[in-house]
């Protein structure tokens, strides 16, 4: 068993990818092949195209791993309720329901039944649901905590990141994801009301194939970013890759979103004391860009 684990880790590398992407096959403005090429040409290693209520299939450009995806697009009056399906094997139709919890749970379960990993999208989009509803959901491990889309109100209040902390404080195993939710490649870069690509992503430690990447997401072997790059990361240790003279603030966070330790610099570590509940790391640079490591439960 030890030899197998060592072999897997030896083959794993850091891979950058986007988990929430739209093309002209739904409400994006560019053909799927152009979208995939955009990400490949900018150094992304993998991409999940998540057009609304369909699986968009194209040939992968050389050097880019394409993972099957869909945004299951459900709603109640004035409440958009969306769940991404990552690595699924068949299209999932919106499952409907009478309450946000019922709708989301039915779609989460349907994604699982289709062989996919569910990602609960943008809770603050239309202020559709919050921490109370998330606490009632089961069978999911991924939550959008950062998004490049200008209309999904990620920062709240309350922020999607603070909802994540509520879940973690209650002992839930949930990992935080950053995504583009990209729709627009043909808009001027100066426009602020468009969903442009390249704003947020995840970096996964995995082998360079779809199955390995999806498994790494499911077990939380990744970090999320809106621009900060990390060389090393765990719940209690981080090393930042310096860029463009930026300065970095490193925070270790525990129960209730409380900052346990804070420092300036490009590396830091934290020693668990046993009363934190969980520990996760967040890095903020002097331009406001961020990176989030995944949490570790503290054994009392």
Which residue ranges define each predicted feature?
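A metal-dependent hydrolase metal-coordination microenvironment
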Residues: 9-139, 144-164, 179-186, 286, ...
